[in-house]
Amino acid sequence: MTRHFASAFLVAAVAATLAGCSITRPSPVKQMYLLEPPAVAAVAQTSPLSARLGTVTVAAPYRERTFVVREADLRFETDFYHEYVVAPAPLIAEAIASALVQSNVFARVIPPGTPPEADLTIDAFVGALYADNRDPKAPGAELAITFYVSRPDRAVAPVWSKAYHRRATLSTVSAATYAAAQSASLGDILGELSRDLAAQRFAR
């Protein structure tokens, strides 16, 4: 993905050089994207418990707005010209909260930022959020999230946790395709999360 974008940047740089010493050169235009997962289906049975979305933490390499591209096993690059509208953490937090409401897993869903007056607290850690260009012939979008469910009134250790991972193959190398793939992967993960939470039958 970066190589494709880098070519465009190189052309722009050459054009700017040929333009001479123009005082009024246009500033680079950034393209911004949202994470917009599809709606989650409702589960068959709703738990009588309430749940609050706690903290959504994104791993350091991916927590900024700019898109991240993995070019090698140990080399990540940021794409200055393509970014999320806001940082990934609040985008993903909003998506999780919406999915919990849509799925009807719990009788009540308390949004993040409110006091922990709920039966359960759900935290999330995003361990991967990047475009994988290690194999240019098969570029992909990687997303990994681990969820932790705890009871604020009891032990600190989570009563349940599970890691989810999705890799979407990109049909074309573009920022728009990458953003759409991550939105679809996030929706898929949230759908599976809702079904898993419904199957747990957490006791009061």
Task: For each feature predicted by the language model, list its residue ranges.
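Surface-exposed short loop/turn segments
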Residues: 22-44, 103-155
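C-terminal motif of bacterial Sec signal peptides marking the signal peptidase cleavage site
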Residues: 17-20
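Envelope-exposed proteins and targeting segments
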Residues: 47-54, 63-65, 72, 80, ...
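Sec-exported extracytoplasmic/periplasmic mature domains
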Residues: 97, 101-105, 131, 194-202
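A structural "domain/chain start" motif
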Residues: 22-89, 199-204
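Extracytoplasmic/secreted envelope proteins and their assembly/folding machinery
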Residues: 89, 93-97, 103, 183-186, ...
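Short secondary-structure boundary motifs at beta->alpha junctions and helix caps
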Residues: 75-83, 153-195
